[in-house]
Regions:
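N-terminal pre-domain and mature-chain start segments
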Residues: 1-128
Length: 128
C-alpha cells in the first residue's frame, strides 16, 4: 500500500480503496490499519483493493477453522522451526496484522498460544 501511495502520488486519506470482500470503501482508520498490517493490495477488475478490518477478522477466523495445523506456545514453535520467534513472520490470529518484534516477545513471555495456519504462525497482536 505504501508503494502504491508513492506511485499514484496520493495520500492515504485521498486514496479510494474498496474492500475486496465486501466492496465497501475503506475509511481512513481502515486504510491506516491495512497499511500497518503490511498486507498486499490486489488488483481485480482493473481496480486496487484491500480488506477492511471486519472482513479481515472474518477471513482470519475462517482460515483458522479450515487450515489450522497445530497450536503451541513459543517454545514449541522455536523447537519446530529451529529459530527464535523474533526471526519468524507472525501475523495476528484475529486481524491478520503483522506482529512487531516486541509483540512477538510479549506473546512469548505471556505464554500466548501460537497457531500454525497455512504455513504461517499466528498469535494475537496488542490491538486484539
Amino acid at each position: 500500500l505504501e508503494q502504491l501511495l508513492k506511485f499514484l502520488n496520493v495520500t492515504l486519506d485521498t486514496l479510494m480503496l474498496p474492500c475486496h470482500f465486501c466492496s465497501s470503501f475503506m475509511d481512513l482508520n481502515n486504510k491506516a490499519s491495512y497499511l500497518a498490517s503490511q498486507l498486499k493490495v490486489i488488483v481485480k477488475d482493473c481496480c486496487f483493493k484491500g480488506a477492511c478490518i471486519k472482513c479481515r477478522r472474518k477471513l482470519a477466523f475462517a482460515e483458522r477453522q479450515k487450515y489450522q495445523v497445530c497450536v503451541g506456545e513459543a517454545d514449541l514453535v522455536e523447537a519446530m522451526v529451529g529459530s527464535h520467534v523474533i526471526n519468524l513472520t507472525v501475523r495476528c490470529s484475529e486481524c491478520l496484522a503483522l506482529l512487531t518484534a516486541s509483540e512477538k516477545l510479549d506473546a512469548k513471555c505471556e505464554l500466548q498460544t501460537f497457531i500454525l495456519v497455512r504455513h504461517m504462525w499466528r498469535t494475537s497482536c496488542r490491538a486484539c
